[in-house]
From Swiss-Prot:
Medulla oblongata and hypothalamus. It is found in: Secreted. Stimulates prolactin (PRL) release and regulates the expression of prolactin through its receptor GPR10. May stimulate lactotrophs directly to secrete PRL. Residues 58-87 form a propeptide. The keyword Signal applies. GO terms for cellular component: cytoplasm; extracellular region. The modification Phenylalanine amide is found at F53. This is Prolactin-releasing peptide. One of its GO terms (biological process) is energy reserve metabolic process. Keywords: Amidation, Cleavage on pair of basic residues, Hormone, Secreted, Signal. It comes from the Eukaryota. Its main location: secreted. One of its GO terms (molecular function) is neuropeptide hormone activity.
């Protein structure tokens, strides 16, 4: 019984210590950004700095053309199954 009480007392003290330590930690603001960091430095090394420097707009090559249909990436069904386009 004494071992159980000692164990619970240790758990209680550990919980209080961790709770107190968490309240004293310094929380950094995500809005503080260092202006001397250059996103081109990362991009020239093949690193995409999307999270740090904001979202990049899609380039014109990435936008699908309105007249072209997207390619379907399906495999033909084996057996006697007919597709809905065959009628």
């Amino acid at each position: 019984m004494k071992v159980l009480r000692a164990w619970l007392l240790c758990l209680l003290m550990l919980g209080l210590a961790l709770r107190g330590a968490a309240s004293r930690t310094h929380r950094h603001s995500m809005e503080i950004r260092t202006p001397d960091i250059n996103p081109a430095w990362y991009a020239s090394r093949g690193i995409r700095p999307v999270g740090r420097f904001g979202r990049r707009r899609a380039t014109l090559g990435d936008v699908p053309k309105p007249g072209l249909r997207p390619r379907l990436t399906c495999f033909p069904l084996e057996g006697g199954a007919m597709s809905s386009q065959d009628g």
